[in-house]
Regions:
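Eukaryotic intrinsically disordered, low-complexity regulatory linkers and tails enriched in Ser/Thr/Pro
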Residues: 1-63
Length: 63
C-alpha cells in the first residue's frame, strides 16, 4: 500500500509505504509523516490511509 505525500519544503509529491515511515504526527489540522529525515504533509484524502499505515507500522490491528 502506497500513500501520496507532499513535501513540507517545496510542495513536491512522493509515494511511500509503511516500511519507509518512521513516524506520524498531528499539528493543528495537518498530519505530518516522517520518512527518513524529511517531513511530508498528508493530503486530506489520504488521512484514512495514514491510519492504516500507523496500524501496519505498529504490527497490525491485532497483536
Amino acid at each position: 500500500m502506497f500513500v501520496r505525500l507532499t513535501r513540507k519544503d517545496d510542495g513536491g509529491a512522493v509515494y511511500v509505504n509503511a516500511a519507509q515511515v518512521r513516524g506520524v504526527s498531528e499539528e493543528r489540522d495537518v498530519t505530518w509523516v516522517y520518512v527518513g529525515k524529511l517531513a511530508y504533509m498528508v493530503e486530506e484524502s489520504a488521512k484514512a490511509v495514514v491510519t492504516l499505515l500507523e496500524a501496519e507500522m505498529n504490527g497490525g490491528f491485532l497483536k
